[in-house]
From Swiss-Prot:
One Pfam family recorded for the sequence: Mug135_C
Gene field: new22
Family assignment from sequence similarity: Belongs to the UPF0612 family.
Protein name from the UniProt record: UPF0612 protein new22
């Protein structure tokens, strides 16, 4: 398995572990596709979906890039 596939597998495994943990157990950081964890890049860890509201634009962009999320800009109608 190449390194990129290994990082994707680790990311998916962490997500599954977090979804199936007992209530009250801390979530594990989900690594980016390159294997880095958000904390390594000094990004705030997201423990709840509400935490996203407190990220700066730059932090959001770093998260999107880390998880390879590409947004399509809206079309401008004339």
């Amino acid at each position: 398995m190449n390194d990129n596939n290994s990082c994707k597998l680790t990311m998916l495994t962490r997500r599954l572990e977090n979804m199936t943990q007992e209530y009250g157990q801390p979530d594990l950081p989900v690594p980016f596709l390159n294997g880095d964890e958000p904390g390594k890049l000094k990004l705030p860890l997201s423990e709840r979906h509400e935490d996203v509201d407190y990220l700066t634009k730059e932090q959001c962009i770093q998260y999107f890039n880390g998880y390879s999320i590409h947004l399509i800009p809206p079309r401008i109608s004339s």
